[in-house]
């Protein structure tokens, strides 16, 4: 099943971070924070302005993004946990 976000929303898959500390200690699942990085899987058509025009989104599918710990709404699609969030929830795009 594919999911197509509407307007200024995007679908993001979290990128799992290291489960080890710098000192080599393995962290149990309960001690790990939710990842705040992800890959954009799909984007909506854009933000609808007050004058009716649509502004294209700055992020695109394939971008690696940073977002706040509590950003977006978690959904399960085909057993995979994804996030749907507004583009404004994105703090930045990782480049390089």
Swiss-Prot record:
Family matches, as InterPro entries: Chaperonin_GroES (IPR020818), Chaperonin_GroES_sf (IPR037124), Chaprnonin_Cpn10_CS (IPR018369), GroES-like_sf (IPR011032)
GO cellular component: cytoplasm
Subcellular location: Cytoplasm
GO MF entry, a single one: metal ion binding
Similarity field: Belongs to the GroES chaperonin family.
HAMAP family: CH10 (MF_00580)
Name of this protein: Co-chaperonin GroES
Native organism: Psychrobacter cryohalolentis (strain ATCC BAA-1226 / DSM 17306 / VKM B-2378 / K5)
Originating gene: groES
């Amino acid at each position: 099943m594919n999911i197509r976000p509407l307007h200024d929303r995007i679908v993001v898959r979290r990128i799992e971070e290291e489960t080890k500390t710098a000192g080599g200690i393995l962290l149990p699942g309960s001690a790990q924070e939710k990842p705040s990085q992800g890959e954009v899987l799909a984007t909506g058509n854009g933000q609808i302005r007050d004058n009716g025009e649509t502004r294209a989104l700055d992020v695109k599918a394939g971008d690696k993004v940073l977002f706040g710990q509590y950003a977006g709404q978690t959904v399960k699609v085909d057993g995979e946990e994804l996030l749907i969030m507004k583009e404004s929830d994105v703090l930045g795009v990782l480049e390089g």
